[in-house]
């Protein structure tokens, strides 16, 4: 649909895919006019008859589906390089000769200064974004989702729902669920349940006001003065549990614990939270963000309490190096030093008349592990940590029976069976089942290589790669075959070697019935099915008999 009108190669690269939205028909004309084999979300929805749109971006050449535009764009560059018929003008490649002939007609009628032209009306634009916006006027009738009440059509169902709420609200008889408190009606039962939480909060607020008694004019209600001099009053009390708060928004957020309301939802995995700070902290798992760095060793943490707990390890090690007295491991001593940074809101605890204020006491002591000295703020975190020392693994997988010491590890492992990959890379669209895998993958996009070998100076993006490389200098081979006693420096080499004893051949050729124990043998074998020069560089025309050689060659063109 987007054709760059020029005689010579396009400046951005002839094989560069151009992104475009809009449905089309399965004809040779429209198939080749779409940008570089990229199919839109609307096209997939219209042709699949309402199938799920999770992987609706489809390549027009190989029919593979992808979760996002970026992943499809990266795939299309490699997929198009395999097509056998290149355009002599711009280098774009096609699978069939009629498509190439149709494409060449565009160059025959083009002029160098017309830019991006609409193939329907001939109007030219300086940029492809302006052309995309213009094409929506032509493709209005192709939008797959139609409003049943008017003539408007939409690409996505959420656009239709927003339009229906704004322009076509349901009639009173179509809203059978009526609130008994205020008389407001709703079309769905879950909408009524969500609305009733407002009245529950109002009832709790009235009960709290009655429990606190009448307020003096001109000042908020306060409790009896507590010993401690500068203790701050907490006038807002929860009617259900009696917990007090200094500010009313904290009380409103606390009420959600009793009502069960969780209005803040994670857009990545759908998990819901009562407070927005909890959601912000949770989303760092998906993004891999660790905003709290340690000033001593550079290690980064997602949460500030974890950084404070980690910094105590450096303080203990400094005291040990200076010969200072160390507290016993079983009973840690409270230090009178103030916290590194004053918290904006101290811990909310029930305070009654005559009871000492928690703010006047020393900061809460950490629960310290007797084996390694690591401190934890909560006892349940300490118990989970101590399972690592004892070897206890109480959480078992229901699918394969594998045991884990932490429930979070079991949840992450269960994604192996379910196939769920909630962590997506923003650069290439690749998805991962664990946040740590995404964080390690992000280093592939970063140009820096922070892990340097002290022996030869070679740099690596990942620390395990450096550890495996250093075994070349040390000669260490820790992985021993139990069958023949042969040792290897890397575990992957041992796994590959053991297939000689087991006879396993997991790599099967898709073109014939042969299978191989090594992936390299399969790659070498597949060359016999591929004719010479099957992989052609779309920029300079050089041909290769292996896709890996083509990709390595394209790096010279900065593709």
Swiss-Prot record:
<keyword id="KW-0539">Nucleus</keyword>
<feature type="zinc finger region" description="C2H2-type 3">
    <location>
        <begin position="116"/>
        <end position="138"/>
    </location>
</feature>
<feature type="zinc finger region" description="C2H2-type 15">
    <location>
        <begin position="535"/>
        <end position="557"/>
    </location>
</feature>
<feature type="region of interest" description="Disordered">
    <location>
        <begin position="1"/>
        <end position="47"/>
    </location>
</feature>
<feature type="zinc finger region" description="C2H2-type 7">
    <location>
        <begin position="264"/>
        <end position="286"/>
    </location>
</feature>
<feature type="zinc finger region" description="C2H2-type 2">
    <location>
        <begin position="85"/>
        <end position="107"/>
    </location>
</feature>
<keyword id="KW-0863">Zinc-finger</keyword>
<dbReference type="InterPro" id="IPR036236">
    <property type="entry name" value="Znf_C2H2_sf"/>
</dbReference>
<keyword id="KW-0597">Phosphoprotein</keyword>
<feature type="modified residue" description="N6-acetyllysine">
    <location>
        <position position="33"/>
    </location>
</feature>
<dbReference type="GO" id="GO:0043565">
    <property type="term" value="F:sequence-specific DNA binding"/>
</dbReference>
<feature type="zinc finger region" description="C2H2-type 9">
    <location>
        <begin position="367"/>
        <end position="389"/>
    </location>
</feature>
<feature type="modified residue" description="Phosphoserine">
    <location>
        <position position="27"/>
    </location>
</feature>
<feature type="zinc finger region" description="C2H2-type 10">
    <location>
        <begin position="395"/>
        <end position="417"/>
    </location>
</feature>
<comment type="function">
    <text>Sequence-specific double-stranded DNA-binding protein. Binds ATT-rich and T-rich DNA sequences and facilitates DNA bending. May regulate the expression of genes involved in cellular fatty acid import, including SCARB1/CD36, and genes involved in lipid droplet formation. May regulate the expression of LCN2, and thereby influence iron metabolism and apoptosis-related pathways. May regulate the expression of genes involved in glucose transport.</text>
</comment>
<keyword id="KW-0479">Metal-binding</keyword>
<dbReference type="GO" id="GO:2000191">
    <property type="term" value="P:regulation of fatty acid transport"/>
</dbReference>
<keyword id="KW-0862">Zinc</keyword>
<feature type="zinc finger region" description="C2H2-type 8">
    <location>
        <begin position="292"/>
        <end position="314"/>
    </location>
</feature>
<keyword id="KW-0238">DNA-binding</keyword>
<feature type="zinc finger region" description="C2H2-type 13">
    <location>
        <begin position="479"/>
        <end position="501"/>
    </location>
</feature>
<dbReference type="GO" id="GO:0005829">
    <property type="term" value="C:cytosol"/>
</dbReference>
<keyword id="KW-0963">Cytoplasm</keyword>
<feature type="modified residue" description="Phosphothreonine">
    <location>
        <position position="30"/>
    </location>
</feature>
<feature type="compositionally biased region" description="Pro residues">
    <location>
        <begin position="337"/>
        <end position="347"/>
    </location>
</feature>
<dbReference type="GO" id="GO:0008270">
    <property type="term" value="F:zinc ion binding"/>
</dbReference>
<keyword id="KW-0677">Repeat</keyword>
<feature type="zinc finger region" description="C2H2-type 14">
    <location>
        <begin position="507"/>
        <end position="529"/>
    </location>
</feature>
<comment type="subunit">
    <text>Homodimers and homomultimers. Found in a complex with RIP60 and RIP100.</text>
</comment>
<feature type="zinc finger region" description="C2H2-type 4">
    <location>
        <begin position="145"/>
        <end position="168"/>
    </location>
</feature>
<dbReference type="GO" id="GO:0031965">
    <property type="term" value="C:nuclear membrane"/>
</dbReference>
<dbReference type="InterPro" id="IPR013087">
    <property type="entry name" value="Znf_C2H2_type"/>
</dbReference>
<protein>
    <recommendedName>
        <fullName>DNA-binding protein REPIN1</fullName>
    </recommendedName>
</protein>
<keyword id="KW-0007">Acetylation</keyword>
<feature type="region of interest" description="Disordered">
    <location>
        <begin position="313"/>
        <end position="364"/>
    </location>
</feature>
<feature type="zinc finger region" description="C2H2-type 12">
    <location>
        <begin position="451"/>
        <end position="473"/>
    </location>
</feature>
<feature type="zinc finger region" description="C2H2-type 11">
    <location>
        <begin position="423"/>
        <end position="445"/>
    </location>
</feature>
<feature type="zinc finger region" description="C2H2-type 1; degenerate">
    <location>
        <begin position="57"/>
        <end position="81"/>
    </location>
</feature>
<dbReference type="GO" id="GO:0006357">
    <property type="term" value="P:regulation of transcription by RNA polymerase II"/>
</dbReference>
<dbReference type="GO" id="GO:0005654">
    <property type="term" value="C:nucleoplasm"/>
</dbReference>
<feature type="zinc finger region" description="C2H2-type 5">
    <location>
        <begin position="177"/>
        <end position="199"/>
    </location>
</feature>
<dbReference type="GO" id="GO:0043035">
    <property type="term" value="F:chromatin insulator sequence binding"/>
</dbReference>
């Amino acid at each position: 649909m987007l054709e760059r009108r020029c005689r010579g190669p396009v400046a951005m690269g002839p094989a560069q895919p151009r992104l475009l939205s809009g449905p089309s028909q399965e004809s040779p004309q429209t198939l080749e006019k779409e940008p570089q084999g990229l199919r839109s979300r609307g096209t997939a929805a219209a042709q699949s008859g309402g199938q799920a749109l999770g992987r609706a971006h489809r390549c027009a050449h190989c029919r593979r589906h992808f979760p996002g535009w970026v992943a499809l764009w990266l795939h299309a560059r490699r997929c198009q390089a395999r097509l056998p018929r290149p355009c002599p003008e711009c280098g774009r490649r096609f699978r069939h000769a009629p498509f190439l002939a149709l494409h060449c007609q565009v160059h025959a009628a083009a002029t160098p200064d017309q830019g991006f032209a609409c193939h329907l009306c001939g109007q030219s634009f300086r940029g492809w974004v302006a052309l995309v916006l213009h094409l929506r006027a032509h493709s209005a009738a192709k939008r797959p989702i139609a409003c049943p009440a008017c003539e408007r059509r939409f690409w996505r169902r959420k656009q239709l729902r927003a339009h229906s709420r704004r322009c076509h609200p349901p009639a009173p008889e179509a809203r059978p669920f009526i609130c008994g408190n205020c008389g407001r009606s709703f079309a769905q039962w879950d909408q009524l349940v969500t609305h009733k939480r407002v009245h529950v909060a109002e009832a709790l607020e009235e009960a709290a006001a009655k429990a606190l008694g009448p307020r003096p004019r001109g000042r908020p209600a306060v409790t009896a003065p507590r010993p401690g001099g500068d203790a701050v009053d907490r006038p807002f009390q929860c009617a259900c549990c009696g917990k007090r708060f200094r500010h009313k928004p904290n009380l409103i957020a606390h009420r959600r614990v009793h009502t069960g309301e969780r209005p803040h939802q994670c857009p990545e995995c759908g998990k819901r939270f009562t407070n927005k700070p909890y959601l912000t902290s949770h989303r760092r798992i998906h993004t891999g963000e660790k905003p709290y760095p340690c000033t001593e060793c550079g290690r980064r943490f997602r949460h500030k309490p974890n950084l404070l707990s980690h910094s105590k390890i450096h303080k203990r090690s400094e005291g040990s190096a200076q010969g200072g007295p160390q507290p016993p491991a079983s009973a840690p001593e409270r230090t009178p030093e103030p916290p590194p940074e004053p918290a904006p809101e101290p811990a909310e605890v029930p305070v009654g008349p005559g009871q000492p204020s928690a703010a006047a006491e020393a900061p809460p002591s950490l629960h310290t592990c007797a084996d390694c000295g690591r401190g934890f703020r909560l006892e349940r975190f300490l118990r989970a940590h101590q399972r690592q020392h004892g070897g206890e693994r109480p959480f078992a997988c229901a699918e394969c029976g594998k045991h884990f010491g932490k429930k979070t590890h079991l949840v992450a492992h269960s994604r192996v069976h379910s196939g769920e990959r909630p962590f997506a890379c923003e650069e290439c669209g690749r998805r991962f089942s664990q946040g740590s895998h995404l964080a390690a993958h992000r280093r592939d996009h970063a140009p820096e290589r922070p892990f340097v070998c002290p022996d030869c100076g070679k740099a690596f993006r990942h620390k395990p790669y450096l550890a495996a490389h250093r075994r070349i200098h040390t000669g260490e081979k820790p992985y021993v075959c139990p069958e023949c006693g042969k040792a290897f420096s890397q575990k992957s080499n041992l796994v590959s070697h053991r297939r000689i004893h087991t006879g396993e051949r997991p790599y099967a050729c898709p073109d014939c019935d042969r299978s191989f124990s090594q992936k390299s043998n399969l790659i070498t074998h597949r060359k016999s099915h591929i004719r010479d020069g099957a992989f052609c560089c779309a920029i300079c025309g050089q041909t290769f008999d292996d896709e890996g050689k083509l990709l390595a060659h394209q790096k010279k063109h900065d593709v």
